Curated annotation (Swiss-Prot):
Protein name, entry field: Cobalamin biosynthesis protein CobD
Residue ranges of the TM segments: 56-76, 78-98, 153-173, 204-224, 298-318
Annotated function: Converts cobyric acid to cobinamide by the addition of aminopropanol on the F carboxylic group.
Any single Gene Ontology cellular-component annotation: plasma membrane
GO biological process per UniProt: cobalamin biosynthetic process
Superkingdom as given in the UniProt entry: Bacteria
Organism: Yersinia enterocolitica serotype O:8 / biotype 1B (strain NCTC 13174 / 8081)
Pathway listed: Cofactor biosynthesis; adenosylcobalamin biosynthesis
InterPro entries registered for this protein in UniProt: Cobalamin_biosynth_CobD/CbiB (IPR004485)
Amino acid sequence: MTLSAWFVAFLLDHWLGDPPRWPHPVRWMGNLITLLQRAIRTLCHSEWALKWGGAVLWLLVVGITWLVSWGFLWLMTEINPWLGWLAQVWMIYTLLAGRCLSDAALAVFDALQHGTLAQSREKLSWIVGRDTSQLEKPQITRAVVETVAENSVDGVIAPLFFLMLGGAPLAMAYKAVNTLDSMVGYKTPKYRAIGYMSARMDDLANWLPARLSWVLLSAAAWLIQADYRQALRIGWRDRYQHSSPNCAWSEATVAGALGIRLGGPNDYCGERVEKPWIGDERREVALSDIPRSIHLMMMASLLALLLFALTHLLLVGI
């Protein structure tokens, strides 16, 4: 019954996405992080103390998330096995963000096609951290493709990977790791100390899924008749062209598959950040690259599901 829950949850994410009014564990994790962070900042004042406080924050959030997830699943299964199955489906469904990522990217795509530049910039600002106020259409398009490529790892591939390793509770714990990084894992003066542990552990958690994305996205490129040879070549060549040890793997692979260049300098919080270019500019970026990148992400997600399900079947059984 475990594998059937995986596939049903995957289909639910594909069909429904994340309706904004539905309860979602990530919001609960965010509330817990905010509460604990406030308490730690009250108790810890030096940079050294905040670093240790950040480690405690990470341990508490990840530990509580795993324990509550495991306890909830155990309780539902004890009441009735089918109730446990439904609980597992719901948990996995909330972990996957493929449809949500697709919808966010297509919202910018639609604004670029039918709306104004200001609308496109505003919708892009909802999904990226860079300053979007001065971006033109090619830069907006490039930013959307980068976001789809990067988030294909932590939005789908990595949750499925940890689902294979330790079931829904471990996958939920991974989501807590990812949420911690997105909330406190910054290098700004405010978060550098308290978010140090969260940032490092997120890098560690995504290390293998990011490298698997090179293979999965290249295979996806072959299936959708994109340039899989360049996906493999550029994905390997430019795998370290990023300050993160993980982000460039998926970005470079998508850049190679589409034949465009990603990365480059951007503005963050009023400061110019010089980033290396990723990929070869065999042509100018086009609006059609947004749906093509989504297609790549969706196909790679399906391949990840099949690969991890097959691995689980061979090692554990149904």
